Amino acid sequence: MLRFSTAGESHGESLIALVSGMPAGVPIDQDFVNRELWRRQQGYGRGGRMRIEQDTAHFLSGVRHGKTIGSPIAMEIENRDWKNWTEILPVETGDASKHKAVASPRPGHADLAGALKYDFAEARYVLERASARESTARVAAGAVAKSLLLELGIDVASHVVRVGNVEMERTATWAEIAALRELDEVMLGCVDAETEARMKAEVDRALLTKDTIGGVFEVVVHGAPAGIGTYANWDERLDGVLAQAVMSLQAVKAVEIGRGVTAAASMGSDVHDAIGYAAELPEGAHTRFTRERNNAGGIEGGISNGEDVVVRGYLKPISTLRQPLASVRFDTREETKAAYERSDVCVVPAAGVAAEAMVALAFGRLLLEKFGGDSLRELKRNYDGYLEQIRRF
């Protein structure tokens, strides 16, 4: 089974990503992994931390001579800001006067709930692990999963469809979405220039008012065949697995598959995707069964149906505010303002990149459970045999 875990704190020495269950023989390009980490750091409205960190992954195990070797893959991403925190967050007992307490919890963050759960006197240790800095390690792990999927002709990309009250009013093509990854300068990750300009104005408004702003990103899995996931068991349904994966990201408060939200207010005849059959296999398709639209988001009955898999994540505004909301001090219980920690104003494009990683890891897990294989060659034999089967159906 393809699994991953992460370790590390926001201002600790480094972050660790551990990926296990990866078949042997999968090519790993370190430049590709580092490019994914770079993409996560981009976007208009990011904070000062992104000017400090220049994330790169150092492979500790599991990859030799540019390929996976079947053993767990460990990666380390250095926190360059660590040098400023060595006395604040020492491993050994340190000078208490240098500790930087989070004395008043921030509404919307894990501060209060985490301090109550783990019996902390204040929220510093909660912040350190709950921070979205952890998603850096997820992106590194996701880059490994993407490398596997790409060997099978399956690609994963994202774009931003909404920031604040500005929403893109048309459907993006796969070519437009994929092209965003090639840009060397990222604004807000929207494929429509006019819409992106209005999105930027929304971020500027939040900057001027010392506020934060959320939005919606869309992740697309392109090139996947029908048959990933199952209706047979509740915890193996593809939509459920993807929703949990994306929902686990910091600040994501809702997940949508296909036209999930508006479908609830529509008639069935306007929602469901009629089925056709082509005389010849359409270019890029795995079967002759066709759809003229994709309201289902590529998933029916918990199983991929051969169309692009489309997942949207709804991101709340970042909870650290430069004009803090009312809170209460942990030590005195007196009313005060919430703590402020250096933060971003808008992270929707970066969250989309992190969601790509989670979707790739989740999709890769179900794919390996279906086709198996201790090596890439074995996996490809199994996969190619299945593709031939559904082509002939």
UniProtKB/Swiss-Prot annotation:
Its biological purpose is as follows: This reaction introduces a second double bond into the aromatic ring system.
Cofactor remark = Reduced FMN (FMNH(2)).
Top-tier EC class: lyase
**Residues the record lists as binding FMN:** 129-131, 250-251, 301, 316-320, 342
Where NADP(+) binds, per the record, is at: 40, 46
Entry coiled-coil feature ranges? none
Q: Which SUPFAM superfamilies does this one have?
A: Chorismate synthase, AroC
Give the quaternary structure. Homotetramer.
The EC code for this enzyme is 4.2.3.5
Its required cofactor(s), as named, are:
FMNH2
**What does the organism's lineage look like at the top?**
Bacteria, Pseudomonadati, Acidobacteriota, Terriglobia, Terriglobales
Q: Is Flavoprotein among the key words of this record?
A: yes
Pathway where it operates = Metabolic intermediate biosynthesis; chorismate biosynthesis; chorismate from D-erythrose 4-phosphate and phosphoenolpyruvate: step 7/7
Biological process terms from the Gene Ontology for this record are: amino acid biosynthetic process; aromatic amino acid family biosynthetic process; chorismate biosynthetic process
Q: Which family does it belong to?
A: Belongs to the chorismate synthase family.
Catalytic activity annotation: 5-O-(1-carboxyvinyl)-3-phosphoshikimate = chorismate + phosphate
What is the official name of this protein in its record? Chorismate synthase
Q: Which InterPro entries match?
A: Chorismate_synth, Chorismate_synth_AroC_sf, Chorismate_synthase_CS
- Any idea which UniProt keywords this protein has? Amino-acid biosynthesis, Aromatic amino acid biosynthesis, FAD, Flavoprotein, FMN, Lyase, NADP
Recorded GO terms, molecular function? Answer: chorismate synthase activity; FMN binding
Cell cycle listed as a keyword? no
GO cellular component entries = cytosol
